[in-house]
């Protein structure tokens, strides 16, 4: 790793910590420079803009998620692999709810920016779909998974539903009274159970 890479990683670490502690919209380049004890010009020299450092932070979080979760090798058959896949959303919520909070802010932040800046992040996210489809095909072959009419639609619909629910639950303040009556983790577990029931071809 070059000296430049070390410096970039350090600045991304500082920025990510600030984004997590506060919010993406509140943190400025000046804040990051002060935390890293460098000049603002250094931040701009390495990243060019706040938008780029935000994407780098998202990539860092994605790397942690990829390394620590979604280990589909744990599954013995196609269904068990997809069970690991969906339950990873729950495990992330338990261990890193701030990741979902960041993702919610990230989506809102980049929605008004040049979409091309998120291309590296989107490419990394696409790899999850490839793992998912491989597990699905294995499940069809070993008989553990029930065939879906449109598996791509099923994939996007279910993952988006889980993401949106997790992002909503990651914000501690309840919006509605009913939000106080339902255990946050139970909501995620319930949705995951419904999804898995749709896929499981081995129910007795």
Positions of predicted regions on the chain:
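Amphipathic alpha-helical linker/stalk segments
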Residues: 57-84, 99, 136-137, 141
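C-terminal peripheral helix-coil segments that are non-catalytic and often amphipathic
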Residues: 91, 130, 134-142, 156-204
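Amphipathic alpha-helical segments enriched in hydrophobic/aromatic and basic residues
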Residues: 19, 28-29, 39-40, 50, ...
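Gram-positive cell-envelope targeting signals
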Residues: 40-45, 100, 110-113, 154-157, ...
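Hydrophobic alpha-helical connector segments
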Residues: 70-98, 151-158, 185-188
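Basic, helix-initiating cap at the start of DNA-binding domains
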Residues: 1-22, 26-35, 52-55
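Short secondary-structure transition hinges
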Residues: 91-131, 152-153
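Short hydrophobic/aromatic patch on the recognition helix
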Residues: 15, 36-47
């Amino acid at each position: 790793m070059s000296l430049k890479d070390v410096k970039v990683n350090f600045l991304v670490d500082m920025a990510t910590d600030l984004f997590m502690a506060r919010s993406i919209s509140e943190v400025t380049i000046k804040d990051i420079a002060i935390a890293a004890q460098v000049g603002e010009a250094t931040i701009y020299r390495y990243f060019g803009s706040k938008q780029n450092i935000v994407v780098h932070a998202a990539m860092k979080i994605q790397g942690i998620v990829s390394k620590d979760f979604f280990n589909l090798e744990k599954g013995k058959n196609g269904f068990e692999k997809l069970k690991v896949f969906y339950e990873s959303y729950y495990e992330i919520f338990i261990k890193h709810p701030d990741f979902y909070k960041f993702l919610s802010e990230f989506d809102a932040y980049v929605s008004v920016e040049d979409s091309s800046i998120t291309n590296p992040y989107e490419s990394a996210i696409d790899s999850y779909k490839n793992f998912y489809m491989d597990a699905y095909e294995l499940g069809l072959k070993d008989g553990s998974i029930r065939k879906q009419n449109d598996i791509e639609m099923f994939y996007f619909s279910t993952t988006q539903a889980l993401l949106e629910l997790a992002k909503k639950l990651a914000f501690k303040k309840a919006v509605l009274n009913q939000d106080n009556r339902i255990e946050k983790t139970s909501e995620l577990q319930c949705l995951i159970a419904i999804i898995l029931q749709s896929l499981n071809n081995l129910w007795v």
